Amino acid sequence: QQAAELNNPSIAQAVARIDAARAASGATNGNMLPTINGSASQSRNNGNDGSDIVRRSRLGTIDASWEIDLWGALRAGRRASDAQLTARTMEWHAARTSIAAEVAQTYVAYRACQAQSAALQSDVVSREETARLTDLLVHAGFSAPAEGYLTDASAATGRQQQIASAAECDLNIKSLVALTGLSEPETRDVLTKNAAIQPRAPEFTLTALPIDTISQRPDVAAAERTLAAASAQINVAQAARLPRLALLGNISFFGIQLSGDSPQANGKSWSFGPSLSLPIFDAGQRAAQADIAKANYAEALANYKQVVVSAVKEVESTLITLNAAQKRLRDAHTAKDKFDKYFNASLARQRFGSASLLELEDARRNKLSAEQNLINLKREYTTSWIALYKAVGGSWLTQTQQS
């Protein structure tokens, strides 16, 4: 998971968006403070009367301005930028949660594939042993050639199923390589070292969750903060249609000297006072900007509602899948146990001649199907817990325990 967070492009994009939002927030906060600028110049020129008099002049100026936030536009802009920064941070958390869940689900799929492959390999050994014994009986004249064909075909079927399962396991490894950014040898080494760590889901039943768990989802929090930013932008746009008041100040230092030994004339001047800007005519531009801000708010509100509805649906659907898988697991364990016993009994009967090969192969298919079904259900149950972790936004257990 750590490797996935370090190397995943989605997380890198989320980090870049956070940096951009943080810079924008800093720029907006700076608008509430005075600005001070300085300038300096020096010039030298000759007179136009043909004389040799050279005039040198120097000028230095310091300008200061401070906009008075009469209508709260600057404060609204700061709220909007802060909300956008929080929204981008929540999107980063959402990306991390999504990547963690995807890595976990792929890891579970790989371990389940390993279990399937092991079961199929054991089945292949059993099929090949049956084929070997049947061939001996056929050559000795105690069994019909058709029975040899059947067992050989059964062994071939088992081998191709095992090969397909091994290929699926390799595909899961390829997915982990893409998710984590590790090389394939590194990924295989990590999986081999942690082979004893098998995914295990909790055993308790969960039928409902507090509604507060929805609000802690990063995507819901991001949508809510985006809505807050859009609301603040309406205040900014409306305030732009009102008069603006600023305090302006200026200090200038100058010096003039003629060529020769003439003295240098120095001086300074200053000014300070308010400046009032009145929007008189702009061909409806400011009104249009206010309408745009309102439309953006309506869009953000609709998106927030959609995100919340989708979040509720995702949590409820995951709970249904989780509880159904948990109930099915009990019967799957029973089915596997009984089909194992049935196959062993059929194998013993077939070797004593009281059961046909068709009965044995039917028992084998049922045994393998029950074992594969149990493995798939275990994977489904575990991945349902992972999906629930993602659906409620990640570390919901800690928050629930704290409450």
What are these regions (language model features)?
Residues 2, 39-63, 186-206, 231, ...:
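Small/polar, glycine/serine/threonine/aspartate-rich low-complexity segments that form flexible
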Residues 387-403:
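Gram-negative outer-membrane assembly/targeting C-terminal domains
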Residues 1-24, 142-144, 198-228, 279-280, ...:
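Bacterial Sec-pathway N-terminal export signals of envelope proteins
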